[in-house]
Regions:
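A mature extracytoplasmic/lumenal domain signature
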Residues: 11, 51, 81, 146, ...
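A short acidic, helix-capping loop that chelates divalent metal ions and anchors anionic groups
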Residues: 15-18, 150-152, 223
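Periplasmic OmpA-like peptidoglycan-binding domain that tethers envelope proteins to the cell wall
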Residues: 19-26, 196
Length: 223
């Protein structure tokens, strides 16, 4: 069976993401995500999307959507932002922790984008990002340049097709070198609460101990 992947266009709908002049992150991410997906589909991957139009879903909804779909990988595409305009430029990728195939995929994507002309700012661990900590599968969040950097926006606009190819090839190169999808291992339920706050407190304790924990809501319980 082919690998399956869920692509997430960051933000959307009432959430524009970062905004610079007339430019909105949600528009750049949707256009780029669809272009990346088209390339991956042409290479035989089973591609699913959190959104294909300008609609809003919370990060939690996106993570649960990926989990329910049972995909092998999750890649979220964003544009970065900095408090001062034109102060920083470059690409970086975020992962839950710097280990496993997700780290390799993040590094491959960054290197492909660096070849186009972006500054490679590396891979950073962000264990508190919802789409990284609540997805069951290896997940990467890619920041494709700073939206308030004229240098990065010029690269984005003038090399759009190459950027889509770079992200797609970074993913494909990773999969080609890893014929086996990382085993999800065994999952253990450690609690069931009617009060979401109690479940959230336990979640934070588990995450602090480096367990890849997440909350499942159903039957009026938080597990």
């Amino acid at each position: 069976m082919p690998y399956s992947i869920m692509l997430d266009a960051g933000h959307g709908g009432r959430d524009p993401g970062a905004v610079y002049k007339e430019r909105k992150e949600k528009d750049d991410t949707l256009r780029l995500t669809l272009a990346v997906g088209e390339i991956l589909e042409a290479h035989g991957l089973d591609v699913q999307y959190t959104r294909t139009t300008d609609v809003y879903e919370s990060p939690y909804q996106k993570a649960m959507e990926a989990n329910n779909a049972g995909v092998d990988f999750f890649v979220s595409i964003h544009r970065n932002s900095f408090p001062s305009d034109n102060a920083v430029s470059g690409v970086e990728s975020l992962v839950y922790d710097k280990s496993g195939i997700k780290l390799k995929m993040a590094e491959n994507i960054n290197e492909q984008l660096e070849d186009i002309g972006f500054v490679n700012l590396g891979v950073k661990a962000r264990p508190n990002l919802v789409v990284l900590k609540r997805t069951k599968m290896p997940a990467v969040l890619v920041e494709v340049g700073f939206i308030n950097s004229d240098v990065d926006n010029k690269l984005f606009d003038e090399n759009f097709e190459e950027i889509a190819q770079a992200i797609a090839y970074g993913i494909l190169d990773t999969l080609e070198s890893n014929h086996e999808v990382e085993s999800p291992g065994y999952e253990v339920q450690v609690g069931a609460y009617r009060n979401e706050r109690y479940a959230q407190n336990l979640l934070e304790e588990l995450l602090e101990q480096d367990f890849p924990a997440y909350i499942v809501e159903g039957d009026r319980l938080y597990r």
